[in-house]
Amino acid sequence: MTLADEEAFLTVHADIPRQGPGMPEDVHWALDGLEVGREARILDAGCGPGADLETLAEARPMARIEGIEQIPHLADEARERLRHFTNVQVMTGDMGALSGFYDFIWSAGAIYFLGVTEGLTLWRQSLALGGAIAFSEPVLEPGAPQAAKDFWADYPQITDYAGLQARVEAAGFDVVDHRALSTAAWAAYYMPLAARVARLRAGADAALEPALAEAEREISLWRAAPEHVRYELMLVRPGTGPS
């Protein structure tokens, strides 16, 4: 991706509530399922513009919460969004090179940049004793229609749930619980993105055209099979396997 392509992509994806599927209910389910304490040390790895950070801050007002995001303008959006929360700090940096220790690491749709096994192995070094991780990752269900396969064509590493579980276990983690994100969680991402694309279309120059077309293509592929385009939300803890 050239610098111009990257700038166009960031323009298209700017000023929307989130950069991937998810709902506040998903965050609450993970916090409850992993029994994350009121004063826990929490990290949102790949926090984007801060949608889930906001939910974490509201759910655990006494916790120490950090977000890390590699893309500066998304980190800036998160800082602006969380400016009223005194217990939240947003850092611009690499989620693969953490320096703190955390009781709970949350990562919505971002661990695939590192690889599931690789990311969990790295993050294990930053987990406090008794700590846990929640992350969402694409899965391709057996018998998925062609539309779902087309949606994930640019992610050849995708696997089914059994394959995802194997990647978790290869990092020395046990699965505590898991569930698929709802269609509403996907709509929470794609509906604002579709509205953003429509607004930009009105006065778009040629430089934005490829990024707009790609966003429209992605949304169209999702709409073709919304029940089969799937993220699995995984709750995991270090086990007795390799670390």
Where does each model-flagged region fall?
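A short acidic, Gly/Pro-enriched loop at the edge of an enzyme's catalytic core
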Residues: G96-I105
